[in-house]
Each structure stands twice: as structure tokens, then as C-alpha cells.
């Protein structure tokens, strides 16, 4: 679940309540449930956590600092939630920072704030189908035992 732009920018308290609060609730539920085998948490972050892609660095890089764009409350709430995951003490967690997701429904969005992009900037997007395929493959690799142990406890941009 995520509360995204443009709504997150108009209702920043709600963005924090949904994006941070729901992540906190999931982590609490994991601890309260107490399974025999440690659960795996796949958190979906966002490249928006690292802010604008202004020249001379147009593309996201490994190790880019967390630096949400000014007034991007979606990014702020997701960065706070990701930190919660990292500091949760869970043995198996991963944060996947998604690019913008483009799907057919985006054609109906008329609010320019949705894009948070400057005119001389690049666009880092993937399709909704490619995003779903990556999650499907992650589950399949875990299920068939080919997902390496080193995958967990890290952050990836996808």
C-alpha cells in the first residue's frame, strides 16, 4: 500500500500515516505473530527518496544519498518507512526502490505535480507489467530455492 503523488503532496500528514504507519504496522505484526521460520519482508521504496536527477548526474547511482526533493512528501514518507525497515531488526528484509511506474491509468492523470520532473531532466520509469513481473520472479526464485541469501538486508533500485 502507498499513498502517492499528487495526493501525498496535498495531504502530507495522510502520506506519513499511510506510508510510514502501514510499514510500522507490518513490522509490528511480524514480531507479534512469531513464526518458527523468520519471515521475509520485501519493502517497496521509491527512487524519489534520492531526489532530483539534475545535471550533471541524470541517472540514479548506487550509494546516492537520501535527499527527497523539496515538498515531495511522498518521498519523505517513503524514506522514513524504509529507514524503519532497515532498523527493524528483522533478519530477512530488502528494500526495492522502484522507478516511476507507467501504466494505462496514468493517461488519465491531469495534475502536473504527479511527475515531479524538471524540463531538462530524464525520466526513470518502468511499466506496471515489468514491475509485476519482477515481483513474480522474486517470489518464484524464493520458492524454488535459487534466491541467494546475500539478497537480503540490502537496498536495490529497480
Q: Which residue ranges define each predicted feature?
A:
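Conserved cofactor-binding/catalytic machinery of classical short-chain dehydrogenase/reductase
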Residues: 22-25, 72, 80-81, 127-130
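Conserved Rossmann-fold NAD(P)-dependent oxidoreductase catalytic core, especially the SDR/UDP-sugar
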Residues: 24-71
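Active-site beta-alpha turn of Rossmann-fold NAD(P)-dependent dehydrogenases/reductases
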Residues: 2, 42-46, 97-99
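Catalytic helix-loop patch of NAD(P)-dependent Rossmann-fold dehydrogenases
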Residues: 17, 54-95
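Alpha-helical substrate-binding/gating segment
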Residues: 121-157
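Conserved internal alpha-helix in NAD(P)-dependent oxidoreductase domains
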Residues: 13, 17-24, 39, 80
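NAD(P)-dependent short-chain dehydrogenase/reductase
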Residues: 86-136
